[in-house]
Amino acid sequence: MLKIGVVLFTFLVLFPLATLQLDADQPVERYAENKQDLNPNERMKMIMSALGQRRCCISPACHEECYCCQ
């Protein structure tokens, strides 16, 4: 009787829990695919802001997102 209980517990409780963990990865993969659709300028802007770096701008066009490179 104990063996049947262990087998039932394994297949009815543990096996479904193990398969549910695989489903949790799907939203992350979808999000990564959406990021690839950005144009290169938007991607560069996101990367630079994440790294805390600013680009160099020519003197009349200097603003908060870049510094003047002369």
Swiss-Prot record:
Cross-referenced InterPro entries: Conotoxin (IPR004214)
Q: In which tissues is it expressed?
A: Expressed by the venom duct.
Gene Ontology molecular function, alphabetical: ion channel inhibitor activity; toxin activity
Q: Which residues, in ranges, are excised as the propeptide?
A: 25-53
Q: What's the domain of life for this entry?
A: Eukaryota
State the organism named in the record.
Answer: Conus litteratus (Lettered cone)
Compartment(s) of residence: Secreted
Q: Does the keyword Acyltransferase apply?
A: no
Q: Which UniProt keywords apply?
A: Cleavage on pair of basic residues, Disulfide bond, Secreted, Signal, Toxin
Please give the positions of the paired cysteines in each disulfide bond. 56-68, 57-66, 62-69
Q: Quick check: keyword Signal in the entry?
A: yes
Q: Which Pfam families match?
A: Conotoxin
Q: What is known of its domains?
A: The cysteine framework is III (CC-C-C-CC). Classified in the M-1 branch, since 1 residue stands between the fourth and the fifth cysteine residues.
Q: Which residue positions does the secretion signal occupy?
A: 1-24
> Its GO CC terms?
extracellular region
Name of the featured protein: Conotoxin Lt3.2
* Family as reported in the entry's similarity comment: Belongs to the conotoxin M superfamily.
Chief place where the protein resides: secreted
